[in-house]
């Protein structure tokens, strides 16, 4: 199946996106696409100080030449992140109140408005957003458009994330990184000439974000096995069937070669379409992304700089590859189910553990809340482990067919220019190890560490990673 056929198939299962235009020079078609999707509407181009000169200013001129009434708003920040105040800022941009939007943008101590209070009637929308940028700007436009009961167009400037086409926006609210429900854009425009010229570190981040779908897929297989989150066939096949091919040219990605960049961007976009089909981020992330959430929520910095999503995910992905390497060394046909069930804590004990682990975290109740959602009683654990013991050889074989080894993934990241050691983003290996209890508990989503806790082999798959000769030897 070629790219055009894959994209057509993906659009057929997409619930929100109807147009995906990718190729060299296609940004010039954006006004035409806008008119097809939003006839007679006003366009409001949202860019930042980096993407405005790269493409935003030219698009603004093209829209006006096409007879489309057009405004623009440029976020005057060298660095900014997907924080709630910028959602509120973008809400005001949709309504044409640029003065109030600028006040929020420049406010050092903005008081966050409760999410449910930001929904507006569609008639309050002044125009339709055209997002010109990468992950953060796209997520801001996605959620603000949803607040106003309308869609938007996303014009990508880098192959840095899978969020362009994903269902939901990842935003920090109340100190916690959360995924807010909102539809993906109705149209995505990806000009490979623009995207291939993006800073190399952004492209490397996108490569790591796409590679994270390898361990995320394996963890979804485990969740499917336990019955907690069954695999959605369309969402699985539209991405996983081609993932190896999309990751096959890390050298071309590093060199900015057009075909390698096009393959990378297509893979990232299909990942988003998978999330649309599943109405969940399950097809694209699991523990690998939770390391990134921890770093975001604790404002981890390296040389004074917050690290990109993809860079953080790179280290989470490598760590989970190492966990699976250790998992495959276990003979779970020898599991003592009775002993594991006897050792399994009560809900109250797990809630207490969650409160203790997250005691000094920016969201201290997060572990308590999430472990409560996914806790299984002893009967459930017995049934799960009994099946695991009986079917481990088959499950192990399927997981091995999905996974990359730590060594293979590290080599791919090295060649693509992505971080391949925690030190590359300013983390010590001890700090990374300390994150694992948080990762296991901080999301209701069933993960491989949950399986290890229930089967009493958590230490066997974690400790060797940080021991002498381990992947992250301390």
At which residue positions do the language-model features occur?
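A glycine/threonine-rich phosphate-anchoring loop and its flanking beta-alpha core
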Residues: 143-245
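A conserved active-site cap/scaffold subdomain adjacent to cofactor or substrate pockets
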Residues: 240-330
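Short Gly/Thr/Asp-enriched flexible loops that form oxyanion-binding sites at enzyme active sites
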Residues: 59, 137-150, 295
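Short glycine/serine/threonine-rich phosphate/pyrophosphate-binding segments
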Residues: 54-55, 134-143, 161-164
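C-terminal charged capping/lid subdomain of soluble metabolic enzymes
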Residues: 2-7, 330-474
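ATP/NTP phosphate-donor binding region
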Residues: 1-128
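Solvent-exposed alpha-helices and their adjacent loops that cap or buttress functional pockets
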Residues: 12-13, 37-38, 119-124, 145, ...
């Amino acid at each position: 199946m070629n790219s055009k056929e894959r994209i057509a198939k993906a659009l057929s299962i997409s619930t929100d996106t109807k147009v995906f235009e990718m190729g060299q020079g296609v940004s010039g078609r954006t006004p035409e696409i806008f008119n097809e999707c939003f006839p007679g509407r006003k366009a409001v181009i949202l860019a930042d100080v980096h993407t405005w000169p790269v493409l935003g200013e030219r698009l603004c001129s093209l829209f006006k030449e096409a007879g489309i009434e057009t405004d623009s708003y440029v976020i005057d920040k060298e660095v900014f992140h997907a924080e709630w105040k910028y959602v509120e800022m973008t809400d005001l941009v949709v309504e044409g109140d640029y003065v109030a939007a600028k006040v929020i943008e420049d406010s050092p101590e903005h008081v966050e408005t409760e999410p449910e209070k930001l929904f507006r009637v569609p008639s309050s929308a002044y125009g339709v957003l055209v997002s010109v940028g990468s992950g953060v700007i796209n997520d801001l436009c996605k959620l603000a458009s949803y607040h106003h009961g309308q869609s938007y167009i996303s014009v990508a400037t880098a192959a840095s994330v899978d969020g362009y086409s994903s269902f939901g926006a990842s935003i920090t609210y109340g100190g916690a990184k959360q995924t807010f429900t909102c539809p993906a854009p109705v149209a995505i425009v990806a000009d490979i000439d623009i995207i291939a010229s993006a800073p190399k570190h952004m492209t490397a981040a996108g490569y790591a974000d796409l590679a994270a779908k390898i361990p995320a897929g394996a963890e979804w297989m485990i969740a499917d096995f336990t019955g907690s989150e069954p695999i959605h066939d369309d969402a699985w096949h539209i991405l996983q069937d081609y993932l190896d091919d999309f990751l096959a040219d890390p050298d071309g990605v590093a060199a900015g070669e057009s075909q390698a960049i096009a393959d990378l961007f297509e893979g990232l976009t299909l990942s988003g379409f998978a999330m649309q089909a599943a109405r969940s981020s399950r097809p694209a992330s699991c523990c690998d992304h939770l390391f990134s959430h921890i770093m975001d929520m604790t404002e981890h910095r390296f040389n004074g700089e917050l690290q990109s999503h993809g860079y953080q995910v790179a280290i989470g992905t490598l760590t989970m590859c190492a966990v699976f390497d250790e998992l495959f060394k276990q003979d779970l046909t020898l599991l003592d189910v009775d002993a594991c069930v006897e050792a399994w804590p009560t809900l109250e004990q797990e809630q207490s553990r969650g409160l203790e682990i997250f005691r000094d975290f920016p969201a201290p109740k997060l572990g308590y809340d999430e472990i409560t959602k996914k806790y299984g009683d002893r009967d459930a654990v017995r049934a799960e482990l009994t099946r695991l013991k009986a079917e481990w050889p088959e499950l192990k074989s399927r997981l091995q067919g999905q996974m990359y080894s730590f060594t293979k993934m590290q080599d791919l990241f090295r060649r693509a220019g992505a971080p391949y050691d925690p030190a590359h983003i300013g983390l010590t290996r001890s700090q990374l190890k300390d994150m694992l209890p948080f990762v296991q508990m901080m999301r209701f989503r069933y993960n491989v560490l949950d399986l290890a806790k229930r089967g009493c082999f958590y230490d066997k798959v974690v400790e060797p990673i940080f021991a002498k000769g381990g992947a992250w030897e301390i």
